[in-house]
Amino acid sequence: MSQTEASKTPKIPDSEPDGAKGKGKQQLETYRVYVVTWNVGSRFPENISLRHLLGLQDVTVDEDVKETNAHMPDIYALGLQEVNAQPQQQVLGLFKEDPWTHKAKELLRKYDYVAVKTEQMQGLLLSMFVRRQHVEHLQDMEAEFTRTGFGGIWGNKGAVSVRFTLYGCGLAFVVAHLAAHDHQLDERIEDYKHILENHHYHVKRYREIYDHDYVFWFGDLNFRLQGSDSSTEVRELLRDESQHEALIQRDQLYQVREKSQKAFQVLQERLPAFPPTFKFREGTSEYDLKRRPAWTDRIMYAVQPLNRQPGMHLSIEQCSYKSHPLYTISDHKPVTSDFTIKLYPNVRAPGVVFSPLSVWKIGDENTVEYRKQAEFDEGPNDWIGIYPAEYASLADYVAYEYVNQAESPTSSDSNHEPDPFETPSHHRRGRHHHRNRQRLRRQQEANSQEQVRLDFADDVELRHGEQYLLIYFRSTGVRGVTSLAGVSGFFVAEKRHGSPHRTEYHVD
């Protein structure tokens, strides 16, 4: 079976965006979003390549990475269902990232992408990757999950999501796994309603899924074909291309979204022009006739007319919608979709500006200096992480300091380790270094900005001769909302010579 792609359809009507708050003239520019959904059937990504799945089969890496990926996605959303969630795998997940996220990260890092957020609920996994040039502009990242299995008690079914604000617009990515089997249509509709009723965020203006400027909803939604045809009869109809449109009209998702409008009516979808993606005999592209073939794996989208601003229009276009029959490790075929969206590249949230730092003396105390912009508000759990220059994930920090805990020695008793993915673990190399003195000094400036100095302890373990950078995170705490407020330039770690001393760096 060859890969098929839908013919291009017009984009949905324009709508107007949330009010922009950046400085200067607001202009819209085009960005690309690439969405993946795949029920992997508890299989591991062994002996397979993800290049085709991620649209990289024709892309090579050369010395000029920025030129290479000029037309590549700005955002990847990898949504998987039935990731191996056996108890031993869940325990292992406390100490290392899941194999699927790791494999995607190791491939995408070659093209200058960073894993910025991962959320998992049992076998349901969502991993977000963003091109490095956009990472420092990510605001208000938050993850949420809703269980729908066994009346909302068990997480084998349900949804996980990641939302963030980028260049003045709110984006929500929701991956779902709904109730299975042909006769469970009403249960799937109830799952959808339950997710909407229980999925809430803590970001002003973006409290619910459909509050967002852009919504991407995808996953193994398990909608089947209406009718009493046998599996063999459906397979025979699929062999007749003239019957494709008649079959898709019988698709339950199409009917509840377009006809009865009982579920997903807010979302848009280009109707699949590819064959049904379920159920296959593993290791083949032949249908397993124990189940009737169905388009269970889907990707939908929406753009919302929030906070109207005259003359400015957001838009979205679904540029491709494909299945990938060459992947045969599970009984589902993966589905991908490539979108273009409009964002405001000139919108910048207030943050911090790091002073130049050229050398980090290994074995010494080092002082980091930064300036808080006038409108920037510190969060109660803000922290600064030290990262390798070529970090591939926001979880790759090697050391960190909490800002507010450093200000008062009596408040430095917490052993909580920050995690941008908001799933605390204790295996990270980063450590919170305590001192019985005030390690943070503030100086108010005349322009309502504040100059801040923060000491890092002398036992920060960096590698001699390698480059690093600093990232300031504004955070409300574990499973809270996280924003990137500033990224420093590169600096080199060098071994100290002579007796220990504190090294301070100042603005030139």
Regions found by a protein language model. Name each.
Residues 31, 74, 123-125, 156-160, ...:
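Residues that flank catalytic or metal-binding motifs in active/ligand-binding sites
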